[in-house]
Amino acid sequence: GTGKSKVLVDNMAMLYDKGKINGAIIVAPKGVYRNWYSQEIPNHLASHIQPKMVLWTALTSKTKDKEYQSLFETGHDLHILIINVEALSTKKGLDFAAKFMRCHKTMLAIDESTTIKNPSAKRTKSILSLGKEATYRRILTGSPVTKSPLDLYTQCGFLNSYLLGYDSFYAFRNRYANMIDRNFGGRRVQLIGSYKRLDELADKLKGFSYRVLKDDCLDLPDKVYIRREVDLTDEQSKAYSTMKSAALALLKGKMATAPHVLTQMMRLHQITCGHLRNDDGTITEIKNNRLKELVNLLDEVEGKVIIWANYVHDIEHIVKTISDEFGSDSIVQYYGAIPAEQRQQNIEKFQDPNSKARFFIGNPQTGGYGITL
């Protein structure tokens, strides 16, 4: 990474030493929030500060409740609550965070702040409301603009609405986007046609943000992209052709809505991956050459390897194939079906130079951002 976490921890320590805060809430996605508890804060917090740090979990017990209550004990300790952003969509998580803030001078920090980019989302509104009670607010992200410059509105608004100069998202949108009208099924809809005044927006950001690129702080070799072409098997080709014809027939003469088109595209993609999920939830296996080519590739490279796959079915097959070829202790897994605590252990195992774990296998939905490997 670029050191975002250390900068935040250092800033938290400075504010604590100056008596500005005595509490902090770190909010991060479920897939990465445990990193703050096990790595980021223990590794970077100044040694003279001995915090009372509690990790939020969905499960409750007498022991866990006692941990939570320790955050409200009086004294001079820095109290830190680490909570996943999904928990702030629940009444229980939101109420506890609000109680914590009422009892502390708090710094509220959002890691991967694109999780609050949607101004109409219930979670975004809850976090913006919560942020108003914080003494200090911070955001961190590796990609502040994921789809549109308009993603910046609520992220910056969380810090302070005056920073961009707009209390209304629609006024902000009209300033920086050209809208066009479209009719869908008799409904008039406004869509973004293009963007404008982006230099002005960039200048505003410079006044209150700090941006660093990996090239500025890491000595990494350039990425090398190599395309490996894998031929479809006869079985795949027939299935693909049949599915393509069926999809075209289904959509012919109809208004092609995005969900319909995406469903057909996903089915075609599944066929190229070597399987097809049927309407009843069962999966049909389709003979393919991908795993054989993957093993050939792994035989050619040395050192650690990260393998991403979109579908759990593919991950399971990749895990079995690599286990058979290189041994079960050569892999760690990171996707939704793996318990959160095990995921964190798998990261540490993969990072350990003395570990036999050579292959990190996961899906980008769970591990595609926010973790440092």
Over which residues does each language-model region extend?
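Conserved P-loop NTPase motor "coupling/switch" region that bridges the ATPase
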Residues: 22-23, 43, 49-53, 106-107, ...
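Conserved helix-turn-beta segment of the N-terminal RecA-like "Helicase ATP-binding" lobe
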Residues: 32-62, 159-163, 325
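SF2 helicase/translocase ATPase core recognition
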Residues: 36, 134-170, 217-244, 358, ...
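Conserved helix/coil segment N-terminal to the catalytic DExD/H
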Residues: 62-80, 85-104
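Loop/turn-to-beta-strand initiation segments
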Residues: 77-80, 105-107, 135-138, 355-359
